């Protein structure tokens, strides 16, 4: 005979385990817990006793409420409408019903109040589930149906036993179209069919009792509540006794008039009294499985539902231990509305939480499809402007062959190309600073004559500075290292009451950029050519610069006092480059001078003034100054100092100015003789103090009256320069990336260049960059004007670089730090020495080359077989010498058949280190015995040779 667990039996019968234990005990079976087992006989007795133990169904109705109930058949109607007669079927059942129903009194009053407030005239009571003691015999798939009615006289519905099987089959889940719900969640049947509520097996019937407020806001689909004692609960409120007074149907509802409900069931008789209020059809709470999830876990039949841990957690945060009955009716109703209004948006501290919607793809208007950029734009910013993903643009760039990232800077052309693929246009709205600072042409009557600006050019050591020194009658060449002019000098010379401004440029090949700048700011070029040397490479370069700038040339043939001077040969060589003397029918003035003997200097100055008169040089001194930076340097006492050649207007002390990316105020000015001046007119060179940084040679100097505008222009230039620097980074294609991987063994030499003036910095850096080869790359990682500081040493330490100082010295702390960190600092005064030393350092980075050195050769004349050694060759040294540790190759008919090391070298059984020419010896080859008479053994060694660039 099989056994059945009590817990499984309770689940099968749909009642609580304790109830099953009580019934088994009443039947005489000793079952103590849910894990106990009973036989089939006990199960049969317990199942057979279920109908006899079912108690009455009590439904209490207020004096003005009539309960309408759908019946499965017409035969059941008299029973439903008969007077209520409560007949307890078992002695224990009524007691359970009364005891368990007591705790539900507050909830019933609260629910009735909510129902009264929710409808207009009559009250609607919420259907409560039948207690387990009364409905223990009800099938797990059946439940009492809620009802709504209205009546003037009291009525009581009869309690009737419910059969074990329902009279009508269970209906499927009700569709939303046949459901009605009012805020407050009172379920109203609209169709006449019976809709029994199917409970989940093992859960037991619907609960009753005082559960407190539900988290779901008051929806209760548990059927009619069990009857309680009238004296415990007090009078129930009626629809007309609400404290707020009767509310007309549909008149005060903010939602407007409610639509009429579906037609009534023809089989059901109309109850006496007023017509029930028509209710609007809204969404009902979830049915079936979803409803069972909402109702919670198993509950005891017939008793008050006990809160589970989840229910307590939900109610504890909101109510903090207080029942919903302690809230006011209005607050409770508003909470019910908030919780069950599907269109209500939750609000927290005034902030709305809106549900995120799907992103709608829209096409921007034509005017919005124009992207405005300033010179450059990053890929991420361009993607943001176009509203697409940056990865799409990166893929497009990769298809074009460029490896880029989201922060890669695109120039205008690349941005146009990318944007056009997505239907966008790119417009360059960069501010043209040249237009802002452009000077309008002056009226002819405002122009005044100005001195000419003369630039002296020529090859190295052809006497340019000596000639200028002779003209100025001042010995400035003594301060130049090696007789080479290192940077531009600007000077004023007066002749016959007229001034001439001279610019001296270096002749070294590294100073090409400085010569080009000098040609652009000058009016006349004096080309100095040594009579004993002729036309040299820098002479040709100066001619090309002058022609490119459209500046007239005056040739000064210097050093005519030397015995080997040949001026005619110089004129002939100049003719080959398009410089034809006026004596030979050309348009170029040539003057033979001697700077050392001071010959024909005045004639040269007169020719300069004559050429200036022909050019009719004029300028307007009565306006804001504009000029060019000839040179910039960092003075230890005065800070950044700029040599400015004023070209237009007058520069005064106190003027605001813009120079490149710097803006400042002119604090002081002094001329080439060190004298302080308050104003500088056109064609006058001055040194300006007051700039925040060292400007680059060749920058335009503009004086302004508004400090704010000067700062704005400088800021814009800084932004533009930063964008251009980012865009300078080489765009690496896939092929270039592959080549870079292949060249992974290339050596790098990092260099930091510091000099006294900006021009020297440029010259040294450019000369060093030209030393780069495919084997060794030279990277100039930093250049600046001024002394070597601790910052430079830190940078050199981090980047493993050497520091080259040109005409400067390191600071004391920087020198100590360099010695501590092992940073190499090289100081030079002549650019040749710097270039040579760096070239040697680059050669030191190269791997040494192994070169074969020939030692000698020997002929095999006899072969000896030695046990445990092998074959030994008896040789005669024909040439050179054979060393013990030398490498050898075996030649047979001038073909190399073996190359390796010499195993043994002996003379008369003695090991020797070497054997010279003319001697005989025995030699054994390492791991090789195939030797024959007549073979030649050639000895050599590999030695390291330093690699050259």
UniProtKB/Swiss-Prot annotation:
GO cellular component entries: cytosol
Pfam families: EF-G_D2 (PF22042), GTP_EFTU (PF00009), IF-2 (PF11987), IF2_N (PF04760)
Ranges where the record places region G1: 458-465
Gene3D superfamilies hit by this protein: 1.10.10.2480, P-loop containing nucleotide triphosphate hydrolases (3.40.50.300), Translation factors (2.40.30.10), Translation initiation factor IF- 2, domain 3 (3.40.50.10050)
Subcellular location: Cytoplasm
Keywords of the record: Cytoplasm, GTP-binding, Initiation factor, Nucleotide-binding, Protein biosynthesis
Predominant location: cytoplasm
PROSITE patterns hit by this protein: G_TR_2, IF2
Bias kind Basic and acidic residues: ranges: 334-344
Keyword Ligase: no
Region (G5): 594-596
Bias (Low complexity): 152-162, 263-276
tr-type G domain location: 449-618
Binding site for GTP: 458-465, 504-508, 558-561
Region annotated G4, chain positions: 558-561
GO molecular function: GTP binding; GTPase activity; translation initiation factor activity
Annotated segments matching region Disordered: 46-82, 145-176, 188-361
Spans annotated as G2: 483-487
Segments of skewed composition (Pro residues): 163-172
Region (G3): 504-507
Similarity comment text for this entry: Belongs to the TRAFAC class translation factor GTPase superfamily. Classic translation factor GTPase family. IF-2 subfamily.
Record function comment: One of the essential components for the initiation of protein synthesis. Protects formylmethionyl-tRNA from spontaneous hydrolysis and promotes its binding to the 30S ribosomal subunits. Also involved in the hydrolysis of GTP during the formation of the 70S ribosomal complex.
The name this protein goes by in its record: Translation initiation factor IF-2
Organism: Trichlorobacter lovleyi (strain ATCC BAA-1151 / DSM 17278 / SZ)
Species classification: Bacteria, Pseudomonadati, Thermodesulfobacteriota, Desulfuromonadia, Geobacterales
